Amino acid sequence: MGTRSTSVSDAVAVLDERSREIFRRIVEGYLESGEPLGSRNLSRLLPMSLSPASVRNVMSDLEELGLIYSPHISAGRLPTQIGLRFFVDAFMQVGDLSAEDRANIDRQVRAESGGNPVESMMNEASRMLSGISRGAGLVITSKSDPVLKHVEFIRLEPTKALAVLVGDHDQVENRIIELPAGVTSSQLTEAANFLNAHMSGQTLPELRKQLSQLKDDVRHELDALSRDLVERGIAVWAGSPDEGKPAQLIIRGRANLLEGLGGAEDLDRLRMLFDDLEKKDSLIEILSLAESGSGVRIFIGSENKLFSLSGSSLIVAPYRDDDDRIVGAVGVIGPTRLNYSRIVPMVDYTAQLVSRLSRNPL
């Protein structure tokens, strides 16, 4: 008899107490060992008295619902992807972290403070998440555009000037630009004043968009050389080395994913996962997944098209900047038999900690 797909609400309505208990034991056994559980072992584990034959009947019902399957003839049962989702949504209990767990995470994430404190913090967060899971810990840092505060053009020589851009947190970017032939010092000042009048509270992409919408105002307020200077200044910042790099991936614990591989097929899936992680579009996709809901998101197997071929699970949560904007994500990628109830609260707390520390670096 073929299986039929089921939803969490369908399964909750259909399953009685013993069915739920048998299903829960099968999933917990899989998450702990990766091995299928048979009816004889299950009958010994259950709190109620059931014969192996009765257990097999329940397992048959669970298999028809699409919650479990048999990997081999006459073998025990393993949860399907639908079954894992049902378990996570209906059975998994996620408690608060203990004070000791929080202190350990704090200590590990803050472990390195030399050099670049923020980069060190991100590396430690990724390493720590890898250490608490059977997967790889990841941190995605997005290239956030600073809110603009001030711009100035400083002539260096007749044909070159230094364009100085100051952000709202006093970060400074300098670029050398080629000057239009014949530009005067007053035109440098005029171009800077025009940009300063329009940039308040905006990022560079926002300013660029606004100026394209104010072409008539630019034409009326500035002469041709000053307009050229404004366009060159914006163009040189837009052409910075970070342009086109919306995110950076920090990943630790890849070796964890090599453990327990079942053969060439598993190795191929792992290779596909690593290939996916190297793609820029993948980082954008993970960030969008983190942004698509509040708190921690759990994606199991093909629920996430990004990792559907490798059959991996992703547990991810966003972190935010001073303005409560999502600027990155932390999480764990690994096999579907991750310890979800243990990892979810740790990913959640780590995201909160990274949010706090990225606002106030070590």
Curated annotation (Swiss-Prot):
Family matches, as PANTHER family: HEAT-INDUCIBLE TRANSCRIPTION REPRESSOR HRCA (PTHR34824:SF1)
The UniProt record lists the keyword Methyltransferase: no
Alphabetical list of InterPro entries matching this protein: GAF-like_dom_sf (IPR029016), HrcA (IPR002571), HrcA_C (IPR021153), WH-like_DNA-bd_sf (IPR036388), WH_DNA-bd_sf (IPR036390), WHTH_transcript_rep_HrcA_IDD (IPR023120)
Organism: Rhizobium etli (strain CIAT 652)
Record's keyword annotation contains Glycoprotein: no
A GO BP entry: negative regulation of DNA-templated transcription
Protein name stated in the entry: Heat-inducible transcription repressor HrcA
Family assignment from sequence similarity: Belongs to the HrcA family.
Superkingdom: Bacteria
GO MF entry, a single one: DNA binding
